[in-house]
């Protein structure tokens, strides 16, 4: 397994940035899939995501990961870092943002019809965090307002080569 991580902030009080990071991770994931799966053929399902703590304001991360042969892990890690570096220096394209936002908006619409979203995500914590109600009300408008400039600024801020944590997990050799 090859894993690349970059520290971000948490979710608490920072939901607008987390929404933008969600789209950035989607763009990064598409680039991982195109390069690692389609061009290199080194892994079937590379992916990316973002996670932020609700309890710790300064704890969150962007992650890219891919399962591959042990002999390919260094190549996978280099590819992950190179793709993040390119996003940081050259930015994403309008087409990439469009491809990231359309499925997200579709998912948002689906959750509006699900009790699990309203009860589990919004209402269950709204008494201790009343802002959740407003976040639920404005999430679609907020996603639709996200600009390419915002995404590219986040890529520059977080995808710094010197702050990348690259991890590979390999099976033990037979002699161990």
Where do the protein language model's features map onto the residues?
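M16 family metallopeptidases and their MPP-like homologs
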Residues: 1-16, 24, 37-145, 163-171
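Short Ser/Thr-interspersed hydrophobic loop/turn segments at strand-loop and sheet-helix junctions
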Residues: 28-32
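Extracellular/periplasmic ectodomains of large secreted or surface enzymes and adhesion receptors
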Residues: 175-176
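Short, exposed beta-strand-loop hairpins at the edges of beta-sheets
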Residues: 155-157
């Amino acid at each position: 397994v090859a894993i690349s991580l970059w520290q971000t902030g948490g979710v608490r009080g920072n939901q607008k940035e987390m929404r933008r990071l969600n789209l950035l991770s989607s763009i990064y994931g598409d680039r991982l899939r195109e390069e690692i799966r389609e061009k290199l053929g080194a892994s079937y399902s590379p992916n990316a995501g973002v996670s932020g703590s609700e309890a710790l304001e300064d704890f969150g991360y962007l992650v890219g990961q891919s399962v591959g042969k042990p002999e390919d892990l260094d190549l996978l890690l280099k590819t992950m870092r190179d793709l993040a570096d390119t996003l940081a220096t050259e930015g994403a394209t309008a087409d990439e943002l469009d491809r990231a936002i359309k499925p997200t908006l579709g998912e948002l619409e689906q959750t509006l019809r699900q009790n699990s979203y309203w009860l589990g995500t919004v209402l269950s914590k709204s008494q201790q965090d009343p802002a959740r109600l407003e976040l639920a009300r404005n999430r679609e408008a907020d996603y639709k307002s996200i600009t390419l400039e915002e995404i590219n600024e986040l890529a520059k801020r977080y995808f710094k080569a010197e702050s990348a944590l690259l991890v590979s997990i390999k099976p033990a050799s037979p002699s161990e």
